[in-house]
Amino acid sequence: MSSQDIHSEKQHHIDMKRGDVAPTVLIPGDPGRVTLFAALMDEAKKVAENREYITYTGKKDGVPISCTSTGLGCPPTAIGVEELIRIGAKNIIRIGTCGAIQPFLAPGHMII
């Protein structure tokens, strides 16, 4: 199989193909958060649901955007990110909660 085939085929885990996602994709871990973000989009459409990976694609202020859940932990996130890149995602932004051990980071701080 050539790399061109890999990039044009439906991806096994996220169940999407090229054209299903916008160039910018938000990736929360929790699948429940995807519907919250979809409610903030214009023209939101559910394009896939497979295992922990749920995706909506729409627009925000006229800009195409997608939101795909990845589940918890590094392995499913890595799988999701690799497959999203194969089908055209260019900007992937992880959103959600995290922990920190630095004393200057209090609950509620935004970490980028």
Language-model features: locations:
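Metabolite-binding pocket within alpha/beta catalytic cores that recognizes anionic/polar moieties
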Residues: 2-112
